């Protein structure tokens, strides 16, 4: 698991491992 971030450039949620 990692930090859940919001990719504003693509309007989606991304998870950093």
From Swiss-Prot:
Superkingdom to which the source organism belongs: Eukaryota
UniProt miscellaneous comment: On the 2D-gel the determined pI of this protein is: 7.1, its MW is: 22.1 kDa.
Descriptive protein name: Putative disease resistance protein PS10
């Amino acid at each position: 698991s990692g930090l859940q971030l919001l990719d504003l450039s693509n309007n989606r949620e991304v998870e950093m491992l």
